[in-house]
UniProtKB/Swiss-Prot annotation:
Expressed in the leaf internal phloem-associated parenchyma (IPAP) inside the mesophyll. Mostly observed in leaves, roots and stems, and, to a lower extent, in flowers. It comes from Catharanthus roseus (Madagascar periwinkle). Disruption phenotype: Large decline in secologanin and monoterpene indole alkaloids (MIAs) accumulation. This is 7-deoxyloganetic acid glucosyl transferase. Induction: By jasmonic acid (MeJA). CDD domains: GT1_Gtf-like. One of its GO terms (cellular component) is cytosol. Pfam families: UDPGT. It is an enzyme of class 2 (transferase). Its main location: nucleus.
Length: 482
């Protein structure tokens, strides 16, 4: 090794699954590592990259880090593929069969992205579901770190998949959805079959999506280290279970709040770092400015969820009939069928004009921190859950699939900062839950949510668990330089 290369910083390759929640979470990790003066090559799908450049400040945000570079690659799907709803799962075989070989070719042709000003890749931080990246790392002798973008509780339940199959809890059949699951250590008293990750809802244990989940989760242990976007005070008991199998585990979350904390420490002007694939309608912030404190229910089901027209109407009637103010994000592609919002009943239109506001996409982090927001009706995606926790906003959870099922159970049963509305979608239940969160038990939920928000912010402040763990991660990466 020449003397010039000896003085170069570590060079980390970061590779997320190309869907919004995963990309967003790993972009925050990339910026945190940039702040520690590491060089970063960020593998991003061409589709994701074009959306980020079009709809976010990502170009200006990373321009201040000369050691950062994007490296676009195909995700193997056609441009008109929705990448949402049930079809979002198409991304897994596509990345394995198309992106995987392209990635290997790219790494070889670019000599692991080494140059006169950049050392070869020091380590690969890959999304935990991209085992082909792990295969390449092992083949080339490059240290591997997996980043799991889901909650610790979801990861652990998936890790216990073989035991769940052996015990007969999977596949879930008949009317046994409320039976307590005993095969996930640390959750034996409260986890029901209906709370297991959505991929467990299959008729046959040989179903491909279940087998993919099982294989991808178990292979995580081959990595030299793992990263989770959570914090010790939130999921400590579950983290203790995971560390029995993966002792070098770095919890660095909530990453969006951690990034803000680090930027403030360095006296860098902080702008909320959106990673949205959709154009944000900021008019909703002006509307919120005119509403009383803690009076508005924010409604958003994330970047993947799709609803039927019947479900749309049940939610709409429930929100209007609750008598509460609401801000509702309705993605352009979030309604099944072509008729979508056509022929909306007049009473819904009138009720929305009186107390509601609807946009195609919102600056969510900013919205959740707005003083007018008093609750969040959410799909329980992990990024949204953490953003709500940091903002001190109680939740009503209507999970759609994947890790969202178990996240919603922890929100309601363990952390007690919200209500779980999974597997139901009728207007009477929605009215009841909205009123319970926003009126009847409002003070109780706000008090608990405020306490959890303080714990989250302490974790990412200097001396906090996540702050110290990120320092430890950086030191570990530096130790990998040969």
């Amino acid at each position: 090794m020449g003397s010039q290369e000896t003085n170069l910083p570590p060079h980390v390759l970061i590779f997320p699954l190309p869907i919004q929640g995963h990309v967003n979470s790993m972009l925050r990790l990339a910026e945190l590592l940039c702040l520690a003066e590491l060089d970063i090559t960020f593998i991003v799908s061409e589709f994701s990259h074009s959306r980020l450049i079009k709809h976010t400040n990502v170009a200006s945000r990373f321009a201040r880090y000369p050691g950062f570079q994007f490296q676009p690659i195909s995700d193997g799907l056609p441009d008109d593929h929705p990448r949402a709803g049930e079809r979002v799962m198409d991304i897994l075989p596509s990345t394995k069969n198309v992106t995987g070989p392209l990635f290997k070719q790219m790494m070889v042709e670019n000599k692991c992205f080494s140059s006169a000003t950049r050392r070869p890749i020091t380590c690969i931080i890959a999304d935990g579901v991209l085992s082909f990246a792990g295969d390449f790392a092992q083949e080339k002798g490059i240290p591997l770190i997996y980043f799991r973008t889901v909650s610790a509780c979801s990861f652990w339940a998936c890790f216990c998949m073989p035991e769940l199959i052996e015990s007969g809890d999977i596949p879930i059949k008949g009317n046994g959805m409320d039976l307590i699951v005993k095969s996930v250590p640390g959750m034996e008293t409260f986890l029901r079959r209906r709370d297991l990750p959505g991929f467990c809802r299959v008729n046959d244990i040989n179903e491909p999506k279940l087998q993919i989940l099982k294989t991808e989760t178990r292979q995580t242990t081959r990595a030299q280290a793992a990263i989770l976007n959570t914090f010790e005070d939130l999921e400590g008991p579950i983290l203790s279970q995971i560390r029995k199998h993966m002792p070098r585990l770095f919890t660095i979350g909530p990453s969006h709040s951690h990034l803000t904390s680090r930027l403030e420490t360095k006296n860098i002007k902080t702008l909320i770092s959106s990673g949205s694939f959709w154009e944000e309608d900021r008019s909703c912030v002006d509307w919120l400015d005119a509403q009383p404190p803690r009076s508005v229910l924010y409604v958003s089901f994330g970047s993947i969820t799709v609803v039927t027209r019947d479900q749309l109407l049940e939610f709409w009637y429930g929100l209007v009939n609750s008598g509460q103010r609401f801000l509702w994000v309705m993605r352009p592609d979030s309604i099944m069928g072509k008729d979508g919002q056509s022929q909306i009943p007049a009473d819904l239109e009138e009720g929305t004009k009186a107390r509601g506001y609807m946009v195609g996409w919102a600056p969510q982090e900013e919205v959740l921190n707005h003083p007018a927001i008093g609750g969040f009706l959410t799909h329980s995606g992990w990024n949204s859950t953490l953003e709500s926790i940091v903002a001190g906003v109680p939740m009503i959870c209507w999970p759609y699939f994947a890790d969202q099922m178990i996240n919603s159970r922890f929100v309601s049963e363990i952390w007690k900062i919200g209500l779980d509305m999974k597997d139901t979608c009728d207007r009477e239940t929605i009215v009841k839950m909205v009123r319970e969160l926003m009126e009847i038990r409002k003070d109780e939920f706000l008090q608990r949510a405020d306490h959890m928000a303080k714990l989250a912010k302490e974790a990412v402040s200097e001396g906090g668990s996540s702050y110290s763990n990120l320092d430890g991660l950086v030191d570990y990466i530096k130790s990998l330089i040969i």
